[in-house]
Amino acid sequence: MNALQQKCRPKHQVLVLKCYPRTIKGAVDVKPNSSELSYLLFYCQSRRAKIQKVGSFLEKKTASDVYHQRIGNVQVTLQILAALIEKSPKDLPLFASCVLSILEQVLKSSDITMVESSIPTFQAFCENHDPTSLAADQAYFRQYVSVVQQYASLASTRPAPGKAQHSKPIALRWRNAGLEAIRSVASSDALSSMVARQYDILVPMILENLWTENEDFLDVLLQRVQGDNNVEDAPLLRRRTSNATAQPSETTGGEPGPNPIAFLGTAVDVDKLAEEDIGVLAMQCLRQVFVAPSRSQTHNPTIALLRFIEERVDQNEQVVKRDAHGKDNGWAIKVFLMAARWAPVADRFTILLTAIEVLTQRPLTDDNLRHHNTQAAMISALLRSDVNLIGLSVMDVLLNLLRHMQRLVQMPGDPDSMRVEDETIGTDEGAIGQRRELLFRLQQCVGDLATHVYYADQISDMIQTILLKLRPSRPTSPPNSSPNGERSDNGAAEDQPLESLFALTVAKIAALKAIKAILWVASPRTKMSGGHINLSRNRVPIQTWDGTQWLLRDPDGLVRKAYVDAVVTWLDRETTPADSLARDESARTTLKNRAAQENNLARRVVSSASARVDKSANAPRSHFLQLLHLAIYDHALQFVDYENDLVLLHVLLAKLVSQLGVNAAKFGIPMIFRLQEDIQDVETPLGKVRIGSLVHGYLWTLTEKFDCEGTAPGSAIHGEIIRRRSKNFWVEGINIPAPAVDLVGTPGQARPPPQMNMRDLESEALLPFDERASLVDCICTGYQELATSPPTSPTTSPGRNFTHPMLGSTLSATPKDETQREVPAQFRELMLGDWTREAVLANTQAGSSQTASLNGTNGTHRNTVNNNNRLGVNGVTSPNGSNSNLRPSSSPTGPNGVQAGRTRKTSIRSNGGGGSPAHSTYRAKAQQPVTSVEQLKAVLSGHLQPPPTSHGINFQHSDDSDDSLVSYDMAPSELSFNPAASGSRQGSPGNTSQAASSPPRRTSQDRTQQLKFGGPLVPGEESVVNGAGGQEGSNGAAGNLGVPISRTTSRTQPQATTAHTTLPRPSTSSKRSIKSRAGSRAGPMSSSWLGEKPPAMDLAALLKGIDSASISDIKSLGAGGKPPY
């Protein structure tokens, strides 16, 4: 009967049955007959129509064998399927459904031996599987997903409900089989198809096998995985050996021998070794998931990873920890970083963007703050790591983080509770602690974002973006603040949805701390061995801080402290020694034109890659230092009752002088001497002591910076400081070197009152320092020594160095000769000149208008700027005085400022105020061709003297032409105080205008009487007392040598204002103490006009500066047409 049945079978069934060897029931490791299997494969290849019948027959036979527990027959069936797949991979779609049905029957058998035998077949199926077939047949798709899910469930570490518990070795075998199947799926092309739900099945099972409370175990697994990869990738370079010389640790197949622990260790050690092997397999599976070159294969597993971590957080597992140094660490961070390193370089940024997307889209409540903190810690760890995130949009990430900050500070409750630094205990306090922790982590994320710099101005753009959010809207701007602080760049501030983000105090503090973190991360090794490293980016320019000085007067003390901390960090990290060199901004345009002409030929040779435009040279002029010193002045008077605020100002002033040198001192010295005069207007004795400490602390800083300790001014300053400190007339914390910002107390909080002797308060006085001219001379001398001491480095090729000085153009680089190492005359005049807050505001407004005009057109807008900044002859006043002090004139003036000679013919750019007939005549004559050879001969022979710089009231200016060689920017020397001409200007109309615009005020009191205490404590102090001079104050003969501490003036002190209002300026007088401004010396620009020998003149500059005037006009004027400035 059996013989007849065999003869009636189809041929494909006969060939299949011949592949099964004769075995007993329950036999394992059975293999098919090789010759019959080869013939079966040939038969299926030659007759493709039979391959579907073969698959159906194997499916029916497997069902019978599984039911009767014929393990050997099942193993033979699985091997036949694997051979068919490998032999005819193109024919797999014909019998793929049969393969999945057979695998599903094996998985339902719950026999570990059958399941382990099915792994090679499933691996061959995944390698040759066509992913497009999954989208074509939904029934086949569901069948495939079911098989994958069953295999993945085998790797679970959690016991399945309703099933018997397996022993430890058997459980490890089940997990190993499941991970092998997962690795097969992860390495196939099916993951790149539309079946994204597979990640939700595979990734959690992989992570379960990697989960451990000891994160160091991950490092061990990673080392083993990397070692295995190195062995696989290493070329076969060993010498061939005979079988007799085979190593005892290797088998003939080249596989490593068994671990000695398996033989020598206990059962516990063997289980640990098996756990480690499973961990290595799980890590290989995770690596295979992320290494695929597909962006979807990076996005989807990242979401699955974040969901698994979220589940662990819900189970109160500690996935993120903090080490002893305060850095985040833990299992979640290590797995997240490993996944980022395994992903393709071009797709790594997808992992970060996915994490930020999940973070920002998650609801923000007190219940899920742990999830936010965990993900923020993971993002911060990835940002500060060395993982390259090519393609990352830094500004988009920054805006998302700022938007999440906004959501955090706008949560229900008191946002100021996040300002508390101490950790509190309790239900509500615990939620507040979680909020503070999340805010701190978001600040870290913003700072760590600076690790990845992909273009030169990225750090500047990041800081400017944050500072832009700090600027208030127009209705809430301070009425007297800088125009830079009021205007918004192209309306971006008003269009941004984050405009109200920093309206809260806690948001301002967080933003400023984030800026500090950016600067710390962007310049990690700024000062090693006293120098700066070369950065592959541009340094943050000073223009970035324009319009932020109002933060120094914020009502909240922590905001003021955070702002000073950010500015001090910027000075520490972003400035170079070249920034302390004097940079004459008034002559910047002339230097640019001259340097452009000299380097024109050299620039033609430079390649296009090297001819990078220097942005610092084209950057608009910054008024930040002027307005910052103005804010310091207002801050000192507004918060005079708080010593911490004055110490904070001292730290800021000291850092400005230390890093910027004379570039900061030219604004700080006039302001500090004005503040010294205002000491007498302070009501309380403690307030006078505090302001006096700030003033002398700044002078102390100048003497240390420019090495003036051994000079007479330095001795006088140090002597007065010693005297005040000996009598407790000093603020604790104003020292040199200045303390760190972190060591300064909270501004706005009063300290305990100092212990002062009331008798000393009634009898002593504060000696002001009036030797201003000698101090400026010492600073100039010290600057010249500092400028000549460091060796100059050779110049680099143009355009290849991104490290530009942050103060301005590189055209004014290291001085070349001895004269250029001196302090410019404009700097000296600024340091010796007068200072008022109205003049500072007017100058900055005029400078901003000029910058806008120079960057715009040459038409009507430039005329409007000049009309706003120049004064007419009708006596209209401005904070700077009359227009007779604004531009030089070639005709001498009389004692009262009236022009003695005929009106000077203007240059092409000079204009008379409007369309007057005289103006038309001058322009017509200026446009006529004239001969200036006689003037040139006079200059070459030495008979032509430079014209005086006095200004006539009829001086007129034109700005409707661009052909003039005179610099359009106003030089500081044209606005400064001229002691030589002060006597002749007392009655001039230009000076009476300033006197009329300001009420009288008291200046330094008359130094004619001795103080009630004894002689000076140091020899240098006597020179200050004996050499002090000045005009009598408003109290007449009642004044003494110093400012009395216990005496209060009849005029009340200006009331403190909020951050959005400015202090009323103390009333001033038109008569100033000449001794306190410039001593008895004449200004540097008046030496040539007093009969001294004029300096050598540049012939090239003179030829360009010859005025277009006739010879008769030259002879009638008796001098050149205009000075060659």
Swiss-Prot record:
Q: Return the Low complexity bias intervals.
A: 788-798, 855-877
- Which cysteines form disulfides? none
What the entry lists under InterPro entries is as follows:
ARM-type_fold (IPR016024), EFR3 (IPR039786), EFR3_HEAT-like_rpt (IPR049150)
Q: Name one GO cellular component term.
A: plasma membrane
Region annotation (Disordered) ranges: 240-261, 471-493, 788-819, 845-1093
Q: Name one Pfam family in it.
A: EFR3
> Which Gene Ontology BP annotations are present?
protein localization to plasma membrane
Polar residues: bias regions: 242-252, 845-854, 878-896, 975-1011, 1046-1071
The domain of life is Eukaryota
Checking PANTHER family in the record gives: PROTEIN EFR3
Family listed: Belongs to the EFR3 family.
Protein name as it appears in the record: Protein efr-3
- Which source organism does the UniProt entry give? Neurospora crassa (strain ATCC 24698 / 74-OR23-1A / CBS 708.71 / DSM 1257 / FGSC 987)
Q: The organism's lineage? A: Eukaryota, Fungi, Dikarya, Ascomycota, Pezizomycotina
Q: Which gene encodes it?
A: efr-3
